[in-house]
UniProtKB/Swiss-Prot annotation:
Compartments in which it is found: Cytoplasm
Protein name (record): Thymidine kinase
Entry keyword annotation includes DNA-binding: no
EC number: 2.7.1.21
Binding site for Zn(2+): C145, C147, C182, H185
Gene (UniProt): tdk
Family, per entry: Belongs to the thymidine kinase family.
Species annotation: Novosphingobium aromaticivorans (strain ATCC 700278 / DSM 12444 / CCUG 56034 / CIP 105152 / NBRC 16084 / F199)
The organism's place on the tree of life at top rank: Bacteria
SUPFAM superfamilies cross-referenced by the UniProt entry: Glucocorticoid receptor-like (DNA-binding domain), P-loop containing nucleoside triphosphate hydrolases
């Protein structure tokens, strides 16, 4: 039976790298995969998914209006898929997570989702909350805080490096905008 997996972590834990390695493992064995990432995250440029260590791959892009069940099942009818991999899964809508569960349950295709658990204020993203609720398997990937502890929080910083305490939930950026911290150092930086 195929499953819905959620690999979650803070920034800089290697989520995209893990996704690209899993994709390579399937393709190396001659199996077809389908990669997805959020349309609003354009940091990869030409390559829709790109890791900090330089690996990258083309991917389909989803937005709030994408019917993932329809798009994936249509592709599967043309060429059987062995796996669907979704990067930036925190940006999925709740109904899209249920569509991915249907891909696993009805089409029998494993779905591997990778994303952040929480935003810069420690709040769950809609997609992450839905995945934490219904995924068959939850796998935490580890990042490291500057103190050596496990980093579980994402601190947003401004141009001078000061903690940002308010703002939109979604602001695309990498190491220049976010710092992965343990809860203790996140709390200190946020003045809590």
């Amino acid at each position: 039976m195929a499953k819905l997996y959620f690999y979650y972590a803070s920034m800089n834990a290697g989520k995209s790298t893990n996704l690209l390695q899993a994709d390579f493992n399937y393709r190396e064995r001659g199996m077809a995969t389908m990669l997805w990432t959020a349309a609003l995250d354009d940091r990869g440029g030409e390559r829709a998914i790109e890791s900090r260590i330089g690996l990258g791959a083309d991917a389909h892009r989803f937005d709030a209006g994408t019917d993932l069940w329809q798009r994936i099942s249509a592709a599967h009818a043309v060429q059987p898929l062995s796996c669907v991999l979704v990067d930036e899964a925190q940006f999925l809508r709740r109904d899209q997570v249920w569509q991915l569960a249907r891909v696993a349950d009805a089409a029998g295709i494993p779905v591997l989702c990778y994303g952040l658990r929480t935003d810069f204020q420690g709040e769950l993203f809609e997609g992450s909350a839905a995945l934490l609720g219904i995924a068959d398997s939850l796998i935490e990937l580890k990042a490291v805080c500057h103190c050596g502890r496990k980093a579980t929080m994402n601190l947003r910083v401004d141009d001078s490096g000061a903690a940002v305490r308010a703002g939109r939930q979604t602001e695309i950026g990498g190491n220049d905008r976010y710092v992965a911290l343990c809860r203790r150092h996140f709390s200190e930086a946020m003045g809590q």
